[in-house]
Regions:
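N-terminal targeting signals for export/organelle localization
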Residues: 1-46
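Conserved Rossmann-like nucleotide-binding pocket used by diverse enzymes
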Residues: 41, 70, 96, 131
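A short beta-strand-turn-helix
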Residues: 44-65
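Short pre-active-site segment immediately N-terminal to redox-active cysteine/selenocysteine motifs
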Residues: 63-65, 69-73, 137
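Hydrophobic beta-strand anchors of alpha/beta hydrolase catalytic cores
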Residues: 66-67, 95, 141
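Conserved redox-active cysteine motifs that mediate thiol-disulfide chemistry
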Residues: 69-86
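Conserved segment of the thioredoxin-like fold in thiol-based oxidoreductases
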Residues: 89-90, 94-126, 138
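Thiol/disulfide oxidoreductase modules built on the thioredoxin-like
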Residues: 112-117, 124-171
Length: 172
């Protein structure tokens, strides 16, 4: 009887852990298709160093822009960072980093340690600007064309499949 109870408990725990593991893939949960084709709002964003502001309409000067919402305390952001470095080498793409609810010193240290893929770095200490972009967690990444039209939104860390998809889009 004790053996049956132990096996039942073990099977139940395996079921629970499997369910939790499968639920971690948030890309399947959130539908990002409804924002594809919409234009981002024209807003003023404060640069990370407080030197001036950046107006989103300025991205019309670039063929493609990738907005990446990140923080130094975010483990998945650390995981995707090497992929942002790869993408930053593409001449058709400018990456704008939006530092989300982060400590400025720690954010600087993160970029010194991991490399800085950002053409422009924005600060968002309260997360307000990120919410205006429809971002509710990090990392999230939004690919925009020069008409300010959203081409793709990625929820979670960019992986190699995402990098290849972005490269394909920006080299067409």
């Amino acid at each position: 009887m004790k053996k049956i109870h132990l096996i039942t408990t073990f099977a139940f725990l395996i079921f629970i852990f499997t369910t939790l593991y499968l639920s971690l893939d948030t890309r399947k949960i959130y539908n990002t298709e409804d924002i594809i084709g919409k234009k981002i709002d024209t807003v003023e964003l404060t640069l990370f160093d407080n030197s001036k502001t950046f107006n989103t309409k300025e991205i019309s000067n670039y063929k493609f822009t990738l907005f990446n919402f990140w923080a130094s305390w975010c483990a998945p952001c650390r995981k995707e960072h090497k992929n942002l470095i790869k993408l930053s080498k593409n001449k058709n793409l400018k990456i704008i980093g939006v530092n989300f609810k982060d400590n400025k010193t720690q954010a600087k240290e993160f970029l010194q340690e991991m490399g800085d893929p950002f053409f422009i770095l924005i600060k968002d200490p309260k997360g307000k600007q990120s919410v205006n972009f429809g971002v509710y967690g990090i990392p999230e990444t939004i690919l925009v064309n020069q008409d300010l039209e959203i081409l793709k939104k990625y929820i979670g860390p960019l992986d190699l499949k995402d990098v290849n998809e972005i490269k394909k889009i920006v080299t067409q």
